[in-house]
């Protein structure tokens, strides 16, 4: 996949990062460019692992500035038309890029594609989110980090907002929407997310609520467009509002879901 760059930010994750890089290099259809950004790691094991990564993997070292800054540094270094961020403790499925790239090549108006997420480690299961819907995206975090995006999306948005410590990927996709880019879900598992004590899933709920308020404040103009986005959503096929949840198909009108999530965040 010579047209794709996979960016792997790493801070003291020597026990995982080699597995992440290997999963990127093992893509069907050819290995992408891989950029690993060492965000000021202090762990000797991490230094040792990064020093033995295969030739061709670009290792960038910087002072510790946080994961968003590390992601942005890697994305800025890329010269390919398509980009994907893979956290150092996660893995790509072997056919991830071969699955995500064709829709982007067929539709020049499409900004990014993403698949389903498989959890492994402390908890296992497939996280099935609803298909892409601009209106629903305002109220629910439905897109994971490891989407394949056009380099132009990164240029237009400026990448990850380094002021966000939670929901930074959600903020990126809202930023893209605000600039006219839409996404598309592919109904296949493309990324494996490691569930462990150091992962952010299950982090303090209060911090998430605060981050959501900041998200809405930053994109207040986009949220004011909610009625027009809702009308656009309602014009779609009913299937867009029916998705397979953890335990089976669930019909959830977007407006109902909005009310539920708004109430949840106010608690």
At which residue positions do the language-model features occur?
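A conserved acidic beta->alpha catalytic loop
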Residues: 38-47, 87
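Catalytic core of nucleotide-sugar-dependent glycosyltransferases
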Residues: 189, 193-196, 202-227
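Short, acidic, metal-binding catalytic loop of nucleotide-sugar glycosyltransferases
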Residues: 22-31
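Short aromatic/hydrophobic "clamp" motif used to bind/position activated sugar donors
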Residues: 83
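Acidic donor-binding loop at a coil-to-helix junction in glycosyltransferase catalytic cores
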Residues: 165-174
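Glycine-rich, basic loop-to-helix element that forms the pyrophosphate-binding segment
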Residues: 46, 62-78
């Amino acid at each position: 996949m010579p047209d794709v760059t996979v960016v792997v930010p790493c801070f003291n994750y020597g026990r995982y990062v080699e597995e992440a890089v290997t999963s990127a290099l093992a893509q069907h259809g050819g290995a992408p460019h891989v950029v690993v950004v060492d965000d000021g790691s202090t762990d000797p094991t991490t230094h040792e692992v990064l020093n033995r990564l295969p030739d061709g993997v670009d290792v960038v070292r910087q002072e510790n500035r946080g994961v968003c800054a590390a992601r942005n540094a890697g994305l800025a270094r890329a010269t390919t038309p398509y980009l994907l961020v893979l956290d150092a403790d996660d893995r790509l499925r072997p056919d991830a890029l071969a699955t995500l790239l064709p829709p982007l090549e067929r539709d020049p108006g499409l900004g990014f594609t993403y698949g389903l997420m498989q959890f492994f480690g402390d908890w296992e299961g497939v996280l099935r989110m609803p298909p892409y819907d601009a209106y629903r995206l305002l109220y629910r975090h439905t897109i994971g980090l490891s989407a394949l995006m056009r380099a132009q999306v990164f240029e237009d948005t400026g990448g990850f907002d380094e002021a966000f410590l939670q929901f930074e990927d959600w903020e990126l996709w809202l930023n893209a929407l605000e600039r006219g880019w839409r996404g598309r879900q592919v109904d296949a598992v493309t990324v494996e997310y490691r569930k462990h004590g150091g992962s952010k899933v299950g982090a303090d709920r209060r911090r998430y609520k605060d981050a959501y308020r900041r998200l809405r404040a930053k994109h207040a103009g986009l949220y004011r467009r909610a009625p027009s986005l809702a009308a656009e959503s309602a014009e779609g096929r009913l299937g867009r509002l029916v998705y397979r949840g953890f335990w089976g198909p669930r019909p959830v009108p977007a407006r109902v879901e909005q009310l539920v999530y708004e109430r949840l965040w106010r608690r």
